[in-house]
Amino acid sequence: MMLRNSCVFALVFFLTIKILTIDTRSISENTIESILNNPTNDTHRKLLHAFTGYRHRFEQSPNFKALRWNARNLKIEGLCELCDIGAPLVRLLLELKETALINEAVSLFCKEYKSLDENVCLGAAHEYMGVVFQVVELAPLTNKQLCALAFDCQPQTDFPVFSWNVTFPNKPKPTPRPPQPPSSGSPILNVLHLSDIHVDFAYKPGSQADCSQPLCCRQGQPAPGHAGAGFWGDYRNCDIPYWTAEATLKYAAEIEKVDFIYYTGDLPAHNVWNQSRADQLYSINTINNMLAKIFPNKTIYSAVGNHEAAPCNLYPTPNIKTDNISWLYEVLADNWIRFGL
């Protein structure tokens, strides 16, 4: 237990508190040496040797002061420096099967790093950490390549691995045909295109609309001198309530003759740090039921957006067996068949 606590202390120190407030020299050299020279557990000694090897890098890095400032202000330069330092440490911990240490360090980071809402930070970590671990373990990429891919720390053109070679069929291109506008009196179709509705079923009129989270208008009282969330919606950090989406679509159905509908996804709200599969399916089924009621006998050509998945943006390919996306595809298929596809 004491060795584990030492490992947690070292990881938290180098990845979290140091970035925020504390100088590395505040830890006694004797403390580090006593841990390193303990022969009880070679694995933990290897781990701590790696950690202490980063001490000099932290103290001597010419960009470290900029990192501390930029991290507080969520600048991409700070994220890149943090990624450059953290990626090899994370890989080492994964190799040693010490993911619990990363979890503990991230939890402390979320509690101490005041520039991020703690609930958003912890929720996002819970949603995405397992995926990050899997990508880091499976991706045949260097640390620099990972940081370039995640945060655009370097142009991806710097790395040949990101330059895909797409071979086209060895056939001549067809001769372009000039556009042929329809003749006067040709039949006309009216198409309704719905996209990015982002309905928030937790929307609360009068609540705080400029909160510390990416999505507001859900709870809390507005600050003195600030207006609360409007009944029909708000232009601040808020999605629309269900009744606004319903009224808008009813209005469209009443004043327009719609022949068919393009429906290109992104129904759920933007609370991506605490969404579950059940939340996403509730949003999808509820909005689809509303569409079927308001536009009966209309064919709806649908697509899926990045926000339908849980976690958001993640659509695992079929070769990922541990966390497949069939739970979403099956529900979408049922709904799309109902829409006439």
Locations of the language-model features?
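Classical eukaryotic N-terminal signal peptides for Sec-dependent ER targeting/secretion
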Residues: 1-13
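Non-catalytic terminal accessory segments
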Residues: 3-6, 18-189, 194, 206, ...
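Membrane-embedded alpha-helices of multi-pass membrane proteins, especially ion channels
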Residues: 15-20, 306-309
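Generic preference for well-ordered alpha-helical elements
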Residues: 80-83, 87, 99, 103, ...
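Structured segments of extracytoplasmic/periplasmic soluble domains
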Residues: 89, 149, 153, 197-200, ...
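Short, flexible/disordered secondary-structure transition segments
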Residues: 94-97, 117, 157-161, 204-205, ...
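Extended active-site neighborhood of metal-dependent phosphoesterases/phosphodiesterases
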Residues: 171-183, 280-341
